[in-house]
């Protein structure tokens, strides 16, 4: 989103969206002062909980709609509850989605099995529209019976798939059991995590090219991953920031923050909308990278994280770090503040029998420092029960 587009969007939203106008006025911000992306950081982040509260107080859209209700063709639902107008035919989001599919290797003439839901939520509709605009033929299977989807995929010669990775794997396994040969060679997965082990099965055992997509009901597709590793490359649109959840200011490379998005949708402009997702910010050329050069590593939800020495720490980051060190069977982080001033960050580790504890301790210190950007003060060994929480915060704040 260039500066002129951003300026036009801010003025349009201020003039036509009562909720956005109240938000800016409440923060003492004039729309004329938002000239660049850097200026955008002055606007408070709108959390999903706040959006839900706005809609509850002023249904159906909480004053966030910037056009008459008659301009809305479709209304979708996401948990909260939160109502979202679907993208209109001229929405720029379609072009971005089509570019993603082309970059992933899809082309006109393909037949796509769409196993995402078409009911209430936008996922099925969004990918349906993107594939048809690409020139593909879509089988709108939705959440229909697996046996019927398998038959349709076989009979119609489906070459591509979009849906959850777990359902794709179950279809492939079912086809294998029944001696059915499928023509699916490429898949877009979304709506749930894609563990490395499952990707390996899909790619190695079944020979599929897998494009894992980060998308939300409110915002559509935001990032994607086409190979090994956890980094997901950002799409060029909408405008995506990774910010400190407390201050709302952008975090540096390698730091973890909340994914915050500004859409260019003039019908329903979501400006500085907080997804609640925490991610590590990957920026190869800080301050110079185009958005499409940047990436994120999703680590979890905001409510599950704790802050240690100014850095947000999520249990999934610790799990990832522990998985890099041989001999670690279980691990728990314990955060204390013994002197009332400085955080003490310790790890309690259950090691495999006969494992080199000294090597594990050094390996974990390096892995956690690299993944979480937090220095480990102490590593101890002992039992760690499976039911115990991965992070224990013993700090006293009174």
Residue ranges, per PLM feature:
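Nucleotide 5′-phosphate-binding alpha/beta core
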Residues: 1-103, 107-108, 341-348, 355-398
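Active-site glycine/GP-rich loop and adjacent strand/helix microenvironment
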Residues: 3-14, 18-22, 134-398
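Hydrophobic/aromatic beta-strand patches that form the interior of the parallel beta-sheet core
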Residues: 35, 47, 112-113, 139, ...
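Acidic/glycine-enriched edge-of-secondary-structure segments
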Residues: 78-92, 128-137, 158-162
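Short secondary-structure capping/junction motifs at helix and strand boundaries
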Residues: 85-87, 106-111, 137-141, 211
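Short glycine-enriched loops at secondary-structure junctions
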Residues: 94, 117-119, 166-167
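Short, well-ordered alpha-helices that flank and scaffold nucleotide-derived cofactor binding pockets
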Residues: 99-102, 129, 173-176
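Conserved AMP-binding loop of ANL adenylate-forming enzymes
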Residues: 102-136
């Amino acid at each position: 989103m260039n500066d002129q587009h951003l300026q036009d969007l801010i003025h349009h939203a201020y003039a036509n969206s009562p909720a956005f106008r109240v938000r800016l006025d409440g923060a003492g911000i004039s729309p004329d002062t938002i000239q660049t992306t850097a200026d955008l950081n002055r606007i408070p982040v709108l959390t999903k909980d706040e959006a839900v509260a706005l809609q509850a107080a002023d249904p159906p859209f909480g004053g966030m709609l910037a056009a008459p209700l008659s301009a809305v063709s479709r209304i979708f639902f996401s948990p909260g509850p939160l109502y979202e107008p679907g993208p209109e035919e001229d929405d720029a989001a379609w072009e971005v989605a089509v570019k993603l599919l082309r970059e992933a290797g899809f082309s006109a003439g393909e037949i796509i099995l769409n196993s995402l839901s078409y009911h209430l939520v936008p996922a099925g509709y969004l990918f349906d529209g993107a594939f048809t605009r690409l020139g593909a033929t879509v089988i709108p299977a939705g959440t229909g019976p697996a046996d019927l989807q398998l038959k349709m995929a076989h009979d119609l010669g489906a070459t591509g798939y979009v849906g959850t990775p777990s359902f794709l794997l179950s279809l492939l396994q079912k086809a294998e059991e029944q001696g059915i040969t499928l023509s699916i060679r490429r898949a877009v997965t979304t709506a749930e995590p894609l563990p490395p082990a499952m990707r390996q099965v899909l790619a190695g055992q079944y020979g599929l090219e897998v494009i894992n997509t980060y998308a939300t009901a409110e915002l559509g597709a935001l990032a994607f991953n086409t190979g090994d590793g956890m980094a997901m490359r950002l799409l060029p649109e909408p405008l995506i920031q990774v910010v400190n959840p407390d201050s709302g200011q952008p975090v540096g490379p390698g730091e973890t923050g909340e994914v915050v998005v500004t859409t260019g949708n003039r019908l329903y402009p979501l400006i500085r909308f907080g997804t609640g997702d925490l991610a590590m910010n990957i920026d190869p050329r800080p301050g110079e990278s185009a958005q499409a050069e940047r990436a994120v590593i999703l680590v979890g939800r905001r409510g599950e994280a704790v802050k240690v020495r100014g850095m947000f720490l999520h249990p999934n980051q610790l799990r990832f770090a522990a998985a890099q060190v041989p001999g670690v069977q279980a691990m728990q982080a314990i955060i204390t503040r013994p002197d009332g001033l400085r955080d003490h960050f310790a790890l309690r580790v259950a090691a495999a029998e006969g494992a080199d504890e000294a090597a594990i301790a050094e390996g974990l210190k390096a892995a956690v420092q690299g993944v979480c950007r937090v220095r480990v003060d102490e590593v101890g060994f002992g039992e760690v029960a499976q039911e115990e929480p991965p992070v224990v915060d013993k700090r006293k704040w009174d």
